[in-house]
Amino acid sequence: LYALYRFWGGKMNEMDTRFANQYNIQWFPGHMTKTLRMMEQEIQHVDASLVLLDARIPLSSLNPEIERITARKPKLYALNKADLADPAVTEEWIKYFRAADAGCVAISAKQKGGANAVKAAIEKELAGLLERRQNRGMGGAKTQVMLCGIPNVGKSTFINTFAGSARAKAADRPGVTKGKQWV
């Protein structure tokens, strides 16, 4: 629309606007579509989802497609990079997510304590499931959690800290770690 506006020298009337609006270009990167389809298939095989958000901009780092895909599973939000965010504001965000009946914890993925806090929060969120497994004699069954989030929220760093070794390559730019990984 802006290009058409510039083309006509900044003079667009109502008819021009209607014409421009009927030719909206819908564009979504193919690799993102592929990943979302894979997530839709894999969500059936996990017990819960862990959505990693940037503590400095939680709503901006929340992808609505991830929300849609993970809607039917127990969910835990981890506000990563909490050491870089204002603690008072981070606490308000935690209250916000908990008010929506979702678990939420503030962490710094670079510190081992963050991974331990997430593990404890996941166990709390899945207490009912773990108890049912115990009653059925499946107490030793592994809990599978899907870690998801937009690029550069710290997923690879979290995986490496949680696993205790460099399982995922991490860098300060998006697209370094691609594909599905079981840790």
Can you say where each PLM-predicted feature lies in the sequence?
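Conserved nucleotide-binding/hydrolysis micro-motifs of P-loop NTPases
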Residues: 56-58, 82-85, 110-113, 176-177
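Conserved beta-strand/loop subsegment of P-loop NTPase cores
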Residues: 47-53, 72-81, 102-106
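Canonical P-loop GTPase G-domain recognition
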Residues: 85-146
